[in-house]
Design a protein with these regions (language model features):
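Solvent-exposed, amphipathic alpha-helical segments
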Residues: 13-16, 20-30, 74-88, 100-103
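C-terminal amphipathic alpha-helix
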Residues: 80-119
Length: 119
């Protein structure tokens, strides 16, 4: 497979998962029943897994060492926030989920901005 095409696919999946995560806010800030909390947690973990794989590929193929380091730091911050969000969803505390979701969304926006091609 063409490496450039693979990276384009990774970036496309990253943007798609990011859009889905950013649109989950309403699902996360309302009081849900037990089954819904479990589904939200599973969906969050699934998206996190896809993002981990694709971000790993994009970062490892980054030609600029500074860019690689910056993306790694932002990705680590994002995954830390998603872990915190996952714990908050498990606790089923809406106020904690709101706070963790906001942190996760901010970290994701920073990561997406850094992924944009340099101009």
């Amino acid at each position: 497979m063409d490496e450039g095409m693979e990276l384009k696919g990774c970036v496309c999946r990253i943007k798609s998962c990011a859009g889905q995560l950013l649109s989950m806010e309403e699902d996360l800030v309302t009081d849900l029943d037990d089954d819904s909390w479990d589904l939200v947690w599973r969906d969050l973990r699934l998206k996190e897994t896809f993002l981990y794989i694709d971000l790993s590929r994009v970062i490892s193929r980054s030609e600029n060492d500074e860019r690689r380091k910056a993306l790694t730091l932002l990705a680590n911050k994002f995954f830390y926030c998603t872990d915190e969000l996952g714990d908050a969803v498990t606790s089923r505390s809406v106020p904690v989920v709101k706070m963790c979701y906001n942190d996760t969304a901010q970290a994701l926006r920073e990561l997406l901005a850094a992924l944009a091609p340099p101009q």
